[in-house]
Amino acid sequence: AAMPLASLIDPSAHKTPIITPFTLSYNGAAITVSNNVWNEMKKNVAMEHNLPKHPISASSLKPVIAQYKQQQKLFKLGMTFPTGTHNYMLRYWLAAGGIHPGTYDPAHNNMSGNIGSDVDLTVIPPPEMISTMVEGVTSGYSVGEPWNQKAVKKGFGVSVITSDAIWENGADKVFGLTQKFAQQNPTTTLKLVKALIRASHWLDENNYANRKEAT
């Protein structure tokens, strides 16, 4: 959802004005950690009725990161793109728990985002999130579905917080068009948005029964 804005403010972007006339999905993302990390992390998680109390704060991750530092190991987490919402939500969650996610310094051409960080946030393509975590390249990740549910279902990791607990009704996927196209093709743009609205209503009909046919 942040990509249209990034296309204008990112120093490395081509400065193409993009409009977003329709939001395709809200929330739908989560933060997942490996089983090894969770086994250590859960020692610091508040419990309720013998179950972890959600949402889980990143503060419970601090002792785990401290152990990595003592062993001179880098604690690495994956995210989809520097200007994507998954990166922003991961950074917010970490910072709220007292973990420095790192900063950017465009004035000195340092866009790593890891200045002063306690963790290393690295870009991983969504389909590779699970495999890189299982292989030990990362210790967890922030991504949209289905990559969190798949990791949980296959027993590879634990989802510690969903995106709606960080930003309720936060836009995830949006329909974007270049401003130039929309201005030159107003009728086509209107018809595209109408089609998306009708499709959305169809997907929600009969208690979401049509979604199976759509997939």
What are these regions, as identified by a protein language model?
Residues 1-122, 134-135, 139-149, 156-169:
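Short, glycine-/small- and polar/acidic-enriched structural segments
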Residues 128-215:
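Pocket-lining segment of extracytoplasmic ligand-binding domains
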